[in-house]
């Protein structure tokens, strides 16, 4: 029983940590590509900015869904029988 709780805590930490790292890397790469594209074609900057913020929100939403799942495993653990 204690092993299950320990592994669930480890899994929740990994879900949150790796999700945060992935989201940060994704947003960083996307931001650098946006700056490259805006420097190449400044007239498209407003259209690109809208798309960039939309994608940044989607990337963050995927991370927050992972946080929600990790919190469900941590506090309402479906693997422990009561």
UniProtKB/Swiss-Prot annotation:
Which InterPro entries does this entry report, sorted A to Z? ATP_synth_csu_bac/chlpt, ATP_synth_F0_csu, ATP_synth_F0_csu_DDCD_BS, ATP_synth_F0_csu_sf, ATPase_proteolipid_c-like_dom, F/V-ATP_Csub_sf
According to Swiss-Prot or TrEMBL, what is its membrane topology? Multi-pass membrane protein
User: What are the UniProt keywords, alphabetically?
Assistant: ATP synthesis, Cell inner membrane, Cell membrane, CF(0), Hydrogen ion transport, Ion transport, Lipid-binding, Membrane, Transmembrane, Transmembrane helix, Transport
Site feature location: Reversibly protonated during proton transport = 60
Its predominant location is membrane
Q: Name one GO molecular function term.
A: lipid binding
Q: What is one term from the GO cellular component aspect held by the record? A: proton-transporting two-sector ATPase complex, proton-transporting domain
Pfam families named among the record's database cross-references? ATP-synt_C
The residues that cross the membrane are: 7-27, 53-73
* Annotated localization: Cell inner membrane
The family this protein is said to belong to? Belongs to the ATPase C chain family.
Name the job this protein performs.
Answer: F(1)F(0) ATP synthase produces ATP from ADP in the presence of a proton or sodium gradient. F-type ATPases consist of two structural domains, F(1) containing the extramembraneous catalytic core and F(0) containing the membrane proton channel, linked together by a central stalk and a peripheral stalk. During catalysis, ATP synthesis in the catalytic domain of F(1) is coupled via a rotary mechanism of the central stalk subunits to proton translocation. Key component of the F(0) channel; it plays a direct role in translocation across the membrane. A homomeric c-ring of between 10-14 subunits forms the central stalk rotor element with the F(1) delta and epsilon subunits.
Subunit structure and binding partners: F-type ATPases have 2 components, F(1) - the catalytic core - and F(0) - the membrane proton channel. F(1) has five subunits: alpha(3), beta(3), gamma(1), delta(1), epsilon(1). F(0) has three main subunits: a(1), b(2) and c(10-14). The alpha and beta chains form an alternating ring which encloses part of the gamma chain. F(1) is attached to F(0) by a central stalk formed by the gamma and epsilon chains, while a peripheral stalk is formed by the delta and b chains.
- UniProt-recorded name of the protein: ATP synthase subunit c
Gene designation: atpE
């Amino acid at each position: 029983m204690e092993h299950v709780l320990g592994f669930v805590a480890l899994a929740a930490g990994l879900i949150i940590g790796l999700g945060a790292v992935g989201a940060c890397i994704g947003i960083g790469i996307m931001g650098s590509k946006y700056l490259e594209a805006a420097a190449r074609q400044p007239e498209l900057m407003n259209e690109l900015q809208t798309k960039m913020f939309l994608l940044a929100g989607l990337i963050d939403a995927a991370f927050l869904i992972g946080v929600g799942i990790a919190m469900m495993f941590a506090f309402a653990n479906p693997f422990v029988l009561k």
